[in-house]
Amino acid sequence: MKTSLRTLSVALAAALVSPSVLAIEKIDFHGYMRAGVGVSSDGGLAEWQKTMVGRLGNESDTYGEIGLGAEVYKKEDVSFYLESMVSMLSDGSNDSETTIGDDAQFGLRQLNLQIKGLIPGDKEAVIWGGKRYYQRHDLHIIDTKYWNISGSGAGIENYTVGPGAVSVAWVRGDANDVDTRITGDSDVNINYIDVRYAGFKPWAGSWTEVGIDYAMPNPTKQQKEYGGLYDADNAVMLTGEISQDMFGGYNKLVLQYANKGLAQNMISQGGGWYDMWHKTDEAKGYRVINTGLIPITDKFSFNHVLTWGSANDITEYTDKTNLISLVGRAQYQFTQYVRAIGEVGGFYQKDTYHNGSNYKQGGEKYTIALGLAEGPDFLSRPELRVFASYLNDSENGKPFEDGTSNDTWNFGVQVEAWW
């Protein structure tokens, strides 16, 4: 037994001092978190339509992402970088939140290898494989990504062509529990081909990006024989955007088109997920987004997101759906660390059905907050906020107080950070 332990100790010591381990000079630690405490007029914090009316004072969860990465090999222009990330989600209701009873949910978000220096003619281009957040385009104040096909995949990223760079990726994004009436597996394999060109500047201070996403459902033989929802067509999503430097900030205009199973993203604030749960053979949708962050004075800044979307035939019952959403967040800096924050948001959505009926949704949110942050920039984090919010459903949907009220208020404290 002593001989076995001695042998194991020698092996571990040899591994720890091996050249491959010593080559890691530093480990990158990065992540995101939000957590807090609060009450509403009917129990704990209420969360309602935050991708439509804004997230400030309208989040009730505890969420975190912890990432570790390291350059594990470096020789001249060639480098191998490993990246990992796990996430945790809970409602923040208890001291010890575990996976027992789904008190907390843990996920594997990223685990990939990125290689630089092996593509002739462009030492900064990246060959990658594994699972990753892939070039996500974020609208922070409404907590959504309008262009996002993250998942397991592989690709070549940022290969210089002319004034910009091309990225090509193959990513997997399956649909789960499509039709449980089938015996056997009801999950459908879906593969995406993503092609982007970014960096062309038509004039000073501008920046553009265009891309195409092609989604290909890949059902099993049994699923094909069953037909129905499993008989889904390939779909396309086109995205074009132009950004402009403006008064020390920026403004961005985004135009998108999608069809088939991707069309619903245009009115759901989605970023590219395929809808396998409805018949979408004739579906088409369009979306226009305008967003920007403008520092109006040294102390006052303003961030906005305007979304207009329209889609036809996104379900077997729906004729047309229209959405408009506008959210604005203003910030006034009292001192380097203390700020006042206000956020106002509203939306209106109308679904018209083939039988002539319609369904309307709409509402507003108003939030005021006092923030403590590590600096005066609009996105300075970490930040602690004391907030009060009023939420109102203007279409009589009664989403609050167990389906009896159209409005509610929130009061609480939240912290948010990324690093």
Swiss-Prot record:
Keywords: Cell outer membrane, Ion transport, Membrane, Porin, Signal, Sugar transport, Transmembrane, Transmembrane beta strand, Transport. It catalyses: beta-maltose(in) = beta-maltose(out). Induction: By maltose. GO terms for biological process: monoatomic ion transport. The keyword DNA damage does not apply. Residues 1-23 form the signal peptide. Its main location: membrane. One of its GO terms (cellular component) is cell outer membrane. It is found in: Cell outer membrane. It holds the Pfam family LamB. InterPro entries: G_neg_Bact_CarbUptk_Porin, Maltoporin, Porin_LamB, Porin_LamB_sf. The keyword Translocase does not apply. SUPFAM superfamilies: Porins (SSF56935). It is a multi-pass membrane protein. HAMAP family: LamB (MF_01301). Involved in the transport of maltose and maltodextrins. Homotrimer formed of three 18-stranded antiparallel beta-barrels, containing three independent channels. This is Maltoporin 2. It comes from Yersinia pseudotuberculosis serotype O:1b (strain IP 31758).
